[in-house]
């Protein structure tokens, strides 16, 4: 049966678990890794836990993983408490099992016209929803959503539903840009911008950062709205302005990598074109938390689309190239999800129900290539992302224990084999 461990009662804290879950339970009871200091976005009593080492205006959506001798915690560092606005990607590290932590390190900074501390301000691109995994070679991978300036899914009417974000050029899917007349441009491997006839325009762009140039002249950022103001900002400044060519407004999948247990990080790299299909629409997003490195060395990351269907992508070369699951374009699950691997090799996916109730479950028997619907497990939770890990044939899942996002608990279940198939033994929590 499931056993329930109280984690954080009557709070709206995000809940995170690592493979050293008992260590993290103790640590989390004594230390707060990230804590907002703005009472507009967090209960004033909780902001008193914020200090110079862990504080910021607002934090949401954490991910925690062990890499070598280090614990790495990643999170959205926000200008407000919304799913949009100026959102950086931040981490902290611990090399003593969570007793002490490094200062906050910003590893991805979005371009912005404005960085106001208000949920009414969305004059910025943003990162959101990190998901970490450890590649077989030891590299730490973070997959995260990136949006050009907009409100993401919360204002779908301004997303570019009719603009293709990638075009086939030299046998490879390359990013596109559009001018105000709707003409498209393609960015080649070297960053040169080609027009719709694939002729070099003389413009170059660092696609992930978005900085566009004509020769040495700075033209603005392809991920921002607007055009050059009278008081021109310098390239690389905290705020800048929109370029005359713009990337389509939609979600993108950016990958960051660390080869030294989280001390230093690569620049974000767009991998969306490797796994996107037309049916996904304007949103193919990361299911935040942690990915899975299977017994066979395959790295799997959980995604989902706006219709709340799930997708898994995988890499067999330490995260260099990514592939979409085979067969049906969507996995048999719902919304944001997480996965664990049983000793039998089966992979169990736990989804996010549309309302309070049993947790939808899917299972893969071929290392994440295909998935089958496994019904619902008797793990009751509201509409909220879970965190789930496995140790042997035991499964530990953190989730709210209420019809709202409160009363966080960790429930413990067990995988078992029935008629040659793996299942999760999950009767109603006691």
Model-derived segments and their meaning:
Residues 17:
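Polybasic, low-complexity RNA-engagement segments
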